[in-house]
Amino acid sequence: MLRTPLWATASLLAAAISLAGCGEDKAPAEQAAAPQTQSEPAASAPDTLNSEAAQAVVKHYADMAHAIFSDAHGTALKLQEAIDALIAEPTDATLQAAKEAWLAARVPYMQTEVFRFGNPVVDDWEGQLNAWPLDEGLIDYVEGDYQHALGNPGATANIIANQEVQIGEDKIDVSQITGELLASLNELAGSEANVATGYHAIEFLLWGQDLNGTNPGAGQRPVSDFIDGEGCTGGNCDRRRTYLKVATDLLVSDLEEMVGQWEAGVAGNYRASLEAESAENGLRKMFFGMGSLSLGELAGERMKVALEANSTEDEHDCFSDNTHNSHFFNAKGIRNIYLGEYLRTDGSTLTGPSLASLVEGVSPEIDSDLKTNLETTEAKMQVLVASANDGEAFDQLIAPDNSEGQEKVRAAIAALVAQTASIEQAAAALGIKDLNPDTADHEF
């Protein structure tokens, strides 16, 4: 069913701002019916889109994808080096260095996610790298009262502690921890909470469970969990070290594969097929990626779900308490695409033909509105970052008794919803109608 464009509903922001936490039962908040309003007409689309200019924008989009995935791969290589150092000599210093490398690796990766929606090669590949939330008992030891997905037979499988795991009537040999084995265990028994690979599996192995709930503090895994021989805590330190090494190597390999998909001048890769399509199709993918990440994924899955359920289990980087940064750089990725700009990890800035230049040529007002909304979203995300830097992380903001903190999250969600409305208007201005960004079944 086609969804009414967001910009046509005058009550949009009021509905978003009225979001409220729902307590521990995780029931969705009741949504007030939006009053019927007169739809505002979209700006007249150009009779013919300048194909050459549009194709240049699509080409630069591919250049940006290659650059950002390359930076994600480069920071993953540094993470790999840090984890190798931790395994070689487990100390508080090498564990801290590995954590810092993981945090640095999240910065470019989160800016890649805007390419996920509209580009099947990214969406089909992404789950092995960034699936969440995960039932960490699949991987390693957990507290006996840890919360996990109901009915998940793998929730306490503990691959690290066992040579085989029992799932229903099936026994799975996990004696040799390899990348192929771990990849095969993702969504084990049909449960999306069974995540054996990617950034969040590595995050859990570095930080351990965050047992603080909505109180201050992240996970506190002791470095002794990685000691070989005498002094090992948590048991099975050799297998924990192997798991961490294998998961990291797989992450690096997966990112290298995606860099290749966006390499220029390679016959048969995804970039070649994208550039062979019409420029209009390319622009649609760009706008759809921006709108879907903005609305269904970031505002919905990553923020609204956690807020409404007051659920620390549903925050994105839950073991490290890095959620504020992941949200900020998701939003930054959306802005990158519209402006055609990306600040690389080496400090250089990649610029080129942009959607903004195309929209400005048709409707300076719509272009200005979207730029304003992008700036507003970034400012609201910066509030979350500043809060975490001041000692109040995302999981504390969504606590049931923290009305002031919840309001900060609601304001960011409202900004994302308004931003998505402007994205739809900008697309329509270029003749791209019925964009219908993915809502992930959320109502705003």
Each PLM stretch: what is its role?
Residues 22-26:
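Bacterial signal peptide processing site
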Residues 16-19:
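Bacterial Sec-type N-terminal signal peptides, specifically the leucine/valine-rich hydrophobic h-region
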Residues 1-10:
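Bacterial N-terminal signal peptides that target proteins for export
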Residues 30-33, 37-39:
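Intrinsically disordered, low-complexity segments enriched in small/polar and acidic residues
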Residues 13:
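Flavin (primarily FAD) cofactor-binding/catalytic cores of flavoenzymes
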Residues 43-444:
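Mature extracytoplasmic or organellar-lumen-exposed domains after removal of signal/transit peptides
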